[in-house]
Structures are given as C-alpha cells and as structure tokens.
C-alpha cells in the first residue's frame, strides 16, 4: 500500500496490454492474476464515448459501480407508489451499505475531483456528449480516482491534460494511500509520483 509503480518502455512493448491483463480485460497467456478478495480495482477508461448518454457527475460516481448501483436502487424503491414492507426492509439494507461506503458524500467528492481537474461546476449536470474531448478525458480520470480504490491502473493519464490539471494529478497521486500502477511516456511525471519504475522491453 502507498506504492506507485511506473511502467515505461517503447511503443508496442506491451505496457497497455499488461494493464489490460491486470484489469481482467484480457486473459494472460500464462500465469495467474490474483487480487485480494474485497479489494476494488479502478481503471482509467480509454473509450471516450462510452458514457456519452450519462450525466457528468454520475459518470464519476460510476467509478465505484457498487455505490452507484445502490443509489439507483434506492431511488427506484423510494419512487414507487405502492411501497411495501419488503421495500422498506430492502431500503433499510441499502441505506446501511450506502452509509458504510460514505455515500452521502459521493456527489460532493465527485464534484471536488472534477473541480480539481478544472471541470467547471456548470458542466457537472450536463451529458458527457456535450463536453469537448479534453473535458471528457478529465471526467474519465476523475471517474478512475473516485472512491479511493484499493488498486488504481492508469494508462497515459496526462494525455490531453493542461499543466494545471497535471500538477493537481501529481499531488493527488503523491498523497494517494493505496496501490497505483501507471503507464506514461512522461518521465518527469513518473519521477514525481512513482516509488518504483520498471522498463518493459520487447518479449
């Protein structure tokens, strides 16, 4: 915990593939990937159009999918006109889990991340499709950082970021208390945030 592992290497050496294997997006050709049960892994999404139909603030909170699912299920239960005793029991269970996950702070935490990355408050309730390409990148980065994940996988996180956003990200990662694995061509950035660095060569 508290370590940041930087991965460098030539284009095509397998850096991004390695992260996809760690995240479970790709199967390893040999060996196994083991993550401690209960630990949450968060990945910087590379598909900039995946959340185009979603509200910006919701997109960030989706970084903790379980928390987002609880919020949606709670809303659906409370919106029912024929609220039953079973609904009340289920709502109580969800409220307990929601509180344990600091759900009441979710929107303010998401907004703090967005503001840190210079996404204006007026954009927080717009659809992702209304944002520019660079704004989308920042929202997806905030999504990856949201909710204090146990393991954070970042593939070229400084791409398309302005200098202020890069400096903010550096400070965030330096103070991050869990495990980070980051691929970047920005050696200065890696030197700032990483406790360890590995150079991947061609197999």
Model segments located where?
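ABC ATP-binding cassette signature C-motif
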Residues: 1-203
């Amino acid at each position: 915990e508290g370590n940041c592992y930087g991965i460098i290497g030539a284009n095509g050496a397998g850096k991004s593939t390695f992260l996809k294997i760690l995240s479970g997006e790709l199967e390893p050709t040999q060996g196994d990937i083991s993550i401690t049960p209960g630990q949450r892994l968060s990945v910087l999404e590379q598909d900039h159009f995946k959340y185009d139909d979603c509200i910006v603030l919701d997109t960030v909170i989706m970084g903790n999918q379980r928390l987002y699912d609880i919020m949606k299920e709670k809303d659906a239960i409370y919106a029912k006109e024929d609220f039953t005793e079973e609904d009340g029991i289920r709502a109580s269970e969800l409220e307990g889990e929601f509180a344990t996950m600091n759900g009441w702070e979710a929107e303010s935490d998401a907004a703090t991340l967005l503001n840190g990355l210079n996404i204006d408050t007026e954009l927080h309730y717009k659809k992702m499709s209304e944002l520019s390409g660079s704004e989308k990148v920042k929202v997806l980065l905030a999504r990856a950082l949201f909710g204090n994940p146990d393991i954070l996988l970042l593939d070229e996180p400084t791409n398309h970021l302005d200098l202020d956003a890069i400096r903010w990200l550096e400070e965030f990662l330096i103070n991050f208390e869990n495990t980070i694995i980051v691929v970047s061509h920005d050696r200065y950035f890696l030197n700032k945030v990483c406790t360890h660095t590995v150079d991947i060569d061609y197999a």
